Amino acid sequence: MKKNIGKITQIISAVVDVKFTNKGKLPQILNALECYNDKQRIVLEIAQHIGDDTVRCIAMNSTEGLVRGMEVVDTGSPISIPVGIETLGRIMNVVGEPIDGKGKIKGSSISSIYKSAPSFTQQSTDRNILVTGIKVVDLLAPYTKGGKIGLFGGAGVGKTVLIMELINNVAKAHGGYTVFAGVGERTREGNDLYHEMIDSGVINLEEPEKSKVALVYGQMNEPPGARARVALTGLTVAESFRDMNEGQDVLFFVDNIFRFTQAGSEVSALLGRIPSAVGYQPTLATDMGELQERITSTKHGSITSVQAIYVPADDLTDPAPATSFAHLDATIVLSRQIAELGIYPAVDPLDSTSQVLDPMIVGEEHYNVARKVQQILQTYKSLQDIIAILGMDELSEEDKLTVSRARKIQRFLSQPFHVAEVFTGAEGKFVNLADTIAGFKGLTEGKYDDLPEAAFYMVGTIEEALEKAKTLK
């Protein structure tokens, strides 16, 4: 078959125009084009048709060294990547090339990164809780198996550490596979995560097929085209795991979904589209919907997705985080004020929500304890202005007791993480759901009113808090 060959006519940053001289043979939108620059394969994705013979493309690699007149070949299909068992333990980029120095990904099947979401009849609506072993999450914003969870937070409040702890806890306690998509984040963090996974046995270098995770990276230094598509590459790998062998439960981590939106905004501006609110692309909701609607559970298997969402300037009303809210089953909001108190994970217990915190799903006891904890913390929050102006002495005895319990609850919501052992020196703790509920039930009922606040800080179960209290007296 004769190849459809074009020539580069214009290069502006990550946007490349290609002219095809074969009349009537203009490649389709989203097709991948290939050209070679000093033996390096460069992939271009068609975004627009301009006139009768020219296509405008977004580059997936750096355009340095490209010149006008270079030959470009139409591959005849969208970007396609290797999927299946062979991707386990490997790191690949947006176009499916291995970037871990371990050679080609052999024997795997190939799949396009563009697919339609499963139909209504294929989707599953069962609701089961996924226990994470993190107290504040399991109690106040429980995760659903096959649900979508958003981690919202500004810069430096602990989104990536929380994601790494979830990978550690859930991937070990849970038999399924994990896919991690690094979208526009720090290369150093991606490298650290890879080596931690090797150390913890999640990645097996000797026998890669025994690994539990596949990694897909498009980090901060990549062009906007790569960052805008790498989440789709990761999702395609996750879908292949979900649909194989009569179904699997898959965990899909994205760090960071905001960078997906940000890259889309850069691409949109380069293509000359008129921006919408706050300078974002006019297709913001569509882009987000196309990604999120594919992250779903079918009757065969499930994809449980955890997405870190950077909040620009800590403003939750910014269009990028606000657009993702609509797609999520649970939202975990990380608060700078709580991080400043030294309480980690810095989850805001009043802002974080979950659709499954419902007595019909989690049970009456869990629901009542969670609501009581939130009620005590809300009362404490409303009393803080009075305390700041008049001091504790002006409060009624009942309010003083509420404040005392709230401060203990606040500290008991902290927990030492396995992945943070290296820099805290404290052994990480996985807390079962029953222990979490029992501990907070005792606190709300006043069973531990006589213990010092410090006993509840950075412990796992309530038994550990009681032991710690003995050493403090």
From Swiss-Prot:
Name the HAMAP family for this protein: ATP_synth_beta_bact
Tell me where on the tree of life, at the top rank, the source sits: Bacteria
Q: Which Pfam family, giving just one, matches this sequence? A: ATP-synt_ab_N
Which cellular components does GO assign to this protein?
A: plasma membrane; proton-transporting ATP synthase complex
Its annotated compartments are: Cell inner membrane
Record the organism.
Rickettsia bellii (strain OSU 85-389)
Q: Name the chain's protein.
A: ATP synthase subunit beta
Q: GO MF terms on file? A: ATP binding; ATP hydrolysis activity; proton-transporting ATP synthase activity, rotational mechanism
> What family is it from?
Belongs to the ATPase alpha/beta chains family.
Q: What is its EC number?
A: 7.1.2.2
In the UniProt record, does the keyword Oxidoreductase occur?
Answer: no
Self-association and partners: F-type ATPases have 2 components, CF(1) - the catalytic core - and CF(0) - the membrane proton channel. CF(1) has five subunits: alpha(3), beta(3), gamma(1), delta(1), epsilon(1). CF(0) has three main subunits: a(1), b(2) and c(9-12). The alpha and beta chains form an alternating ring which encloses part of the gamma chain. CF(1) is attached to CF(0) by a central stalk formed by the gamma and epsilon chains, while a peripheral stalk is formed by the delta and b chains.
Task: Tell me the CDD domains matching this sequence.
Answer: ATP-synt_F1_beta_C, ATP-synt_F1_beta_N, F1-ATPase_beta_CD
Gene name tied to this protein? atpD
Q: What does this protein do?
A: Produces ATP from ADP in the presence of a proton gradient across the membrane. The catalytic sites are hosted primarily by the beta subunits.
Q: Cite the entry's keywords alphabetically.
A: ATP synthesis, ATP-binding, Cell inner membrane, Cell membrane, CF(1), Hydrogen ion transport, Ion transport, Membrane, Nucleotide-binding, Translocase, Transport
How this chain sits in the membrane, per its record, is: Peripheral membrane protein
Enzymatic reactions: ATP + H2O + 4 H(+)(in) = ADP + phosphate + 5 H(+)(out)
| InterPro entries on file | AAA+_ATPase, ATP-synt_VA_C, ATP_synth_F1_bsu, ATPase_a/bsu_AS, ATPase_alpha/beta_chains, ATPase_F1/V1/A1_a/bsu_N, ATPase_F1/V1/A1_a/bsu_N_sf, ATPase_F1/V1/A1_a/bsu_nucl-bd
Q: Which residues form the signal peptide?
A: none
Q: Kindly list the positions annotated as binding ATP.
A: 153-160
Would the keyword Nucleus be found if you checked this record's keyword annotation? no
